[in-house]
Amino acid sequence: MKIIMLGAPGAGKGTQAKMIADKYVIPHISTGDIFRANIKNGTALGMEAKGYMDQGMLVPDELTVKILLDRVAQEDCKNGYVLDGFPRTIPQAEVLDKALTELNDKIDFAINVDVPDENIIRRMSGRRACLNCGATYHIAHVPPKTEGICDRCGNELILRDDDKEETVKNRLTVYHEQTQPLIDFYTAKGVLKDVDGTQDMQVVFDNIIACLEA
């Protein structure tokens, strides 16, 4: 079972990807993680990617797909995998699709965790973090006992730049321009499954499993 996770930043797709991977005992593959692993291990593909990254350039889609195919060819992927963070654009999806087709392979499901923008903004701008011990909170859902203070270590909590409302809105704009078209791409291939991501995490997960096992 080869699965791609789609959804806006903050939709919870990373959490769901991990839960799916745990249930089916298949790898949860993040392109960021495999880039780092290849660079750390000094592989030829990793060094090629590092050359682009060191110059502040984006790694070309063809190279990203090569690194990805190298990962999914490993023994632990023989029963499937969950892809998280790739593809993000139509050109990336097309390169991946072409490469998989040449291997007589394909994506079985694209799960779109659908959450309206206003919910995403509320979710992300309500996050608070402790830089000292790494604990995370949410002012509405998981508030600290004392406002602005970490329960665990007593340090001050901060709103990370990534979670500021303006940053979140900018990320959503990029998502709608670049990644939203993937929904049409995978709908046309007959593999897209839409799931309401506004519900409780376990309910979202149960609905995803129902789609995968229908």
Question: Where are the model-predicted features located?
Answer:
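Glycine-rich phosphate-binding loop of ATP-dependent small-molecule kinases
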Residues: 1-214
